[in-house]
Amino acid sequence: MWLRRRNIVKEDSVVRGMAESCPPKANMIKNKEHLQQIKDFSGLKFGSISPTDIDGFLDFGNRLFIFVETKFSKSELRGGQKLALERLCDACQTQSRTSILIVTNHESSGEIDIGETVVQQYRLRGVWYESTDITLREAIEMFYSNFAIIKKEDK
């Protein structure tokens, strides 16, 4: 399964509804000063185990979980961070919920528009897939339209 750029069908009420309720350029950073604080996890090292972070997480009605990790300039997800995020993503996958881990790249030295970062690879149902030429925003819209159909009785 290759994730590739495609035209998002504007008539698709699910995608249209998502786009209307979540404009692409909505600034969600509430306190930039706190964002720039360095978090020191050195006091939480247990042998070779240390904490990792997640750059983004979206929960679409408990039907679709999307984890996002963003890397600079084609850096790869590796080692303990890769293993931890794989395990988290796979553990959240259930019969009624799809869980996806998306790794993106950026070349920015300043502020990063995460939605415009390019998808490098993604993990779905325990398998890694390579991707090219699609932004994170486009990928999320595609996954949403395929996996997060919320039934009326679930509302």
Give, region by region, the residue ranges found by the protein language model.
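Helix-rich interaction surfaces within compact, conserved domain-sized segments
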Residues: 112-155
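Nucleic-acid nuclease catalytic cores
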Residues: 92-119
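Short, charged/polar surface micro-motifs in flexible loops or helix N-caps
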Residues: 65, 73-76, 106-109
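A conserved alpha-helical element in kinase catalytic cores
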Residues: 80, 84-94
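Active-site-adjacent loop/helix micro-motif of nuclease/hydrolase catalytic cores
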Residues: 49, 74-84
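Short, positively charged
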Residues: 47-55, 59-60
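Acidic-basic catalytic patches of nuclease active cores, encompassing PD-(D/E)XK
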Residues: 2-50, 142-155
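Conserved catalytic cores of phosphodiester-cleaving nucleases, focusing on short active-site segments
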Residues: 56-58, 65-72
